[in-house]
Amino acid sequence: MPKIAEEARAARRDQIIAAAAECFTRSGYHVTTMADIAEAAGVSKGTPYLYFPGKEALFIALYEEWDCALAARVDAAVGELPEPARGSPRVVLAAVASAIAAHVTGNPQTCRVLMEATTLAAYEPAIAATVRTADAASLGQLTGLFQAGIAAGQWPPGTDPALQARLFTAGLYGLMAQWHTAPGSFSLETAMAALAGTGAAGPSGDGGNSQAKGTGT
């Protein structure tokens, strides 16, 4: 396929995904139809099917696109830390939380749609598999971060790193859900900074507190 044709196809695919995000935000997953998405994208009713077999596949593509963009934002934030700070699990955790907050507040439409994924995962097997894959990768990285922090004395000995990763993730999801339910009622950046500052297992002396202050927003 010629390069120009490939670029045009990629652009049209992105156009359809953006239209899907708009429709899912406005009407929800179940009410939205492929015809709605086609209309929002300004294409014929059959065009979305040239790129996606159905609405579920389109939703999954949207989820994966958001997940990749979020991962890139987090990786960039951690990569920008100076070398000494990058070696501190608590500082890295704060950078992760800050990057997630910035991404969510900067992309409220898409993120609001994808909050629905956790509900859809209960009864849509393909969506569930996608969400589980993304969660497993995130939990694995967070577990490793907590393991390093425990070894460095930044969290108490005997702390379960896998459990703390789940608790931290639950805190992030909970804050995002509250922020989307009542936009403007609180600062998501400040709340996530506080979550990272205390850590799922609680603060650990001056090291945890000073790092939280240094990375709060």
Label the model's feature ranges.
Residues 61, 75-110, 161, 165-168, ...:
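Hydrophobic alpha-helical connector segments
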Residues 104-129:
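Amphipathic alpha-helical segments used for helix-helix packing
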Residues 109-110, 130-137, 144:
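Short, solvent-exposed amphipathic helices
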Residues 91, 95-102, 139-140, 144-152, ...:
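C-terminal peripheral helix-coil segments that are non-catalytic and often amphipathic
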Residues 64-70:
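Short, basic, alpha-helical segments at the C-terminal edge of helix-turn-helix-like DNA-binding modules
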